[in-house]
Amino acid sequence: DQQLLAGLGIASAVLQTIVGLMVFLAYSTTPAVARRFGAGEHTGAVRAGIDGLWLALALGTVLAVVGSLTTPWLVSLFGADAAVSEQAVIYLQLSMWGLPAMLIVFAATGLLRGMQDTVTPLWIAGLGFGLNALLNWLFIYGFGWGIAGSAAGTVVAQWAMVGAYAFVVGQLARRHEASVLPQREGLRGSARAGWWLFLRTVSLRIALLATVGVATGIGTGE
């Protein structure tokens, strides 16, 4: 109904903002890996990508915890009525636990692209989307979970994609004898590389959120 769709719209706006701000994990990891791969430093290339994965996990965990605790406040910023806000909070609180997975997927995609492998990310994305659709159908209609089922299905699919990437990256690490432990300098390098892209995305998301806020103020009756 209208309340469900409106709540989903609010929750999606918040999630897309958070994920969009973190897109630098893919676009900073790719060149870092590609530079080393092109120079023949395959171990260093995999190492750089793994540092990106650890950064993604750290950022995602912090965002998931903070986001889950502040979900009611975030939703209240849109000024929606109680029924719409309730649906938005349900969806958003569950979806927050998929954030670490989504950010890891970004970084893993960057790693594989830097290693000149664009096929594996395509397969994982396709299978992940298919699993997401199947789980959404099962949880929403089979179990009758409503909007919570939609969020739960997406979170499970996201972590399944992480499992697939973990297997692929583990194979790469063994093949090129790269450590899977995080390195401080590598984490700092990944963060520095994405700073300007982060600022660009902040500006774009502020404009989008302002638009959603105005639309929410109009209400579902218009």
What are these regions (language model features)?
Residues 1-6, 75-82, 138-145, 205-222:
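Helix-terminus/linker motif at the lipid-water interface of multi-pass membrane proteins
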Residues 2-13, 88-92, 147, 151, ...:
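Small-residue hotspots at the loop-to-helix junctions and early N-terminal turns
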Residues 5-65, 102-121, 212, 216:
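Small-residue-rich hydrophobic transmembrane alpha-helices
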Residues 17-21, 95-97, 123-126, 198-202:
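Hydrophobic alpha-helical transmembrane segments of multi-pass membrane proteins
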Residues 25-26, 66-70, 100, 104, ...:
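Residue-level signal for transmembrane alpha-helical positions in Major Facilitator Superfamily
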Residues 33-100, 134, 140-195:
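Short alpha-helical transmembrane segments in multi-pass integral membrane proteins
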Residues 65, 73, 107-111, 130-138, ...:
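Alpha-helical transmembrane segments of multipass membrane proteins
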Residues 94, 105, 128, 157-161, ...:
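Transmembrane helical elements of multi-pass membrane transporters/channels
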